A protein has these predicted regions:
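Conserved NTP-donor binding/palm subdomain of two-metal-ion nucleotidyltransferases/polymerases, i.e.
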Residues: 1-122, 127-250, 308, 313, ...
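Intrinsically disordered, low-complexity regions enriched in glycine and serine
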Residues: 272-277, 323
């Protein structure tokens, strides 16, 4: 890792609040370089929140750069307000047409951030109930020429904001694991479509439960790694998913917790979010209850074993209330369920790599990791993140150009690089791509 990348990571920990002290390495920061990395990784707003917490003597950047950073942060704030409104309006439009929906990632993820308006927004990913045939048919009755792929169909933009209509939240390239993933989504979909929250003071939407997000967003990151590349923004999202998981179970076991403005269903106003002294909102959504439940026993080498010890020690040392003990048991049971799903889906080693990044890069305490960290896989994934940037747009290893042929050659080259670590996905990728070609022919308008 290069020197400025290391300084960037140190400062990122401070920005997200996993460390409280200003990193000493910041004295050697090249702020122009940090800004370039933040742009590459779509973390401009997150870092600017950290800059606002710094004493003036620690901000050694030129005034022009500071003003540019401030302007971009304000643009992100405005964009999030527009995205909030669009997510609400699009959800309501589908509801009136007879479809239940759930907003994936995006503005639902922003609810977990200390300052929801600092997250770099993208498009609207909306999961629409009904299955591929029904949803594709409905969308094309509105806009006949929209293109469909295996998990979503394009949709007319709403006030300039791109919309993707999902009939499957995500997918895996390995046919066997993907079959299990789609069964999981079918099994838990009811909780997702009925899990409604307030999006600031603008309106109400459905977002996934936190336990669902632990699995879904991991598959989303995995898919990006296999197909185009991932950035730190997706990993910061997952950091807050993990934080959110523990907040939910603590609040669920504590009925005295307020469900109003203190919860993650409340967006602070954009003006209040600019103070730089924001507190992470706590979610108060009821955790998902899997129909199948989790394993009744976890082996000693499983993360859940150490986690229960850590949670139990923490509980006995810091609290004597029944609610704290209940929170520990509830979160441990939920982790058992998540671990069982990750093993079934072939995601155990990848999850271990992500946990290594959560601990080493973001400063996540070991007691909050959902599987044991895997250094070998973590270092590989982290290198991919730093090389490729958000959506792989900055990957200098793309040597085949931007044509369709170049894209396919790049995919083969990527598969070769990934097969050592993720053989099932990498070896199935060419097969899936061939199968997907005929799937798209079937659903071509």
């Amino acid at each position: 890792m290069l020197k400025q990348q290391k300084i960037f990571i140190d400062f990122l920990r401070f920005c997200i609040g996993s460390v409280k002290e200003i990193p000493g390495s910041l004295k050697e920061a090249d702020w122009q370089e940090l800004y370039a990395i933040a742009k590459k990784q779509c973390l401009v707003g997150i870092l600017f929140d950290g800059i606002k917490k710094l004493p003036a003597e620690h901000v050694g950047m030129k005034k022009e750069l500071l003003l540019q950073w401030m302007a971009e942060s304000q643009m992100l704030e405005n964009a999030n307000v527009r995205l909030n409104d669009a997510a609400i309006q699009v959800s309501e439009w589908f509801r009136k047409k007879g479809f239940r929906t759930c907003i994936l990632k995006g503005q639902g993820n922003a609810l977990m951030y200390p300052n929801p308006y600092s997250r770099t927004p993208g498009d609207i990913d909306i999961w629409v109930e009904g299955g591929d045939k029904r949803v594709i048919s409905f969308v094309r009755s509105i806009s006949p020429h929209e293109k469909a792929c295996y998990h979503h169909i394009e949709f007319p933009s709403y006030k300039g904001i791109e919309v993707e209509v999902h009939y499957r939240p995500s997918f895996l390239l390995c046919f066997w694991h993907n079959r299990k993933l789609q069964k999981y989504y079918e099994r838990v979909k009811e909780e997702q479509f009925s899990h409604r929250v307030m999006l600031g003071e603008q309106g109400e939407i459905a977002i996934p439960t936190v336990e669902f997000n632990l699995i879904f967003q991991l598959t989303h990151i995995y898919s990006h790694l296999m197909n185009e590349g991932i950035g730190l923004r997706q990993l910061v999202d997952y950091y807050y998913v993990l934080c959110d998981f523990y907040k939910v179970y603590q609040n669920f076991s504590n009925p005295s917790v307020s469900l109003s403005k203190g919860s993650s269903t409340f967006f602070p106003s954009p003006s209040s979010s600019g103070s730089g002294d924001v507190t992470a909102p706590s979610r108060c959504s009821e955790p998902l209850r899997s129909k199948d439940g989790g394993p009744s026993k976890v082996s000693p080498n499983c993360a859940g074993w150490d986690r229960r010890d850590a949670i139990g020690d923490m509980t006995s040392a810091t609290a004597s209330t029944d609610s704290s003990a209940t929170a520990a048991r509830s979160s441990s049971t939920a982790i058992d369920r998540v671990q069982e799903e990750l093993k079934e889906l072939g995601l155990w080693k990848f999850a271990g790599g992500i946990m290594y990044i959560m601990q080493e890069v973001f400063g996540m305490p070991a007691s909050r990791l959902i599987v044991p960290p895997n250094e070998k896989y973590g270092r590989f994934v982290l290198n991919e993140v730093l090389e490729a940037g958000n959506f792989g747009r900055h990957d200098a290893r793309n040597r085949f150009g931007r044509s369709q042929l170049g894209h396919n050659l790049q995919r083969v080259y990527r598969d070769i690089r990934l097969v050592k670590f993720f053989p099932a996905e990498a070896l199935c990728e060419p097969l899936f791509r061939t199968w997907h070609f005929f799937w798209r022919l079937k659903y071509r308008k």
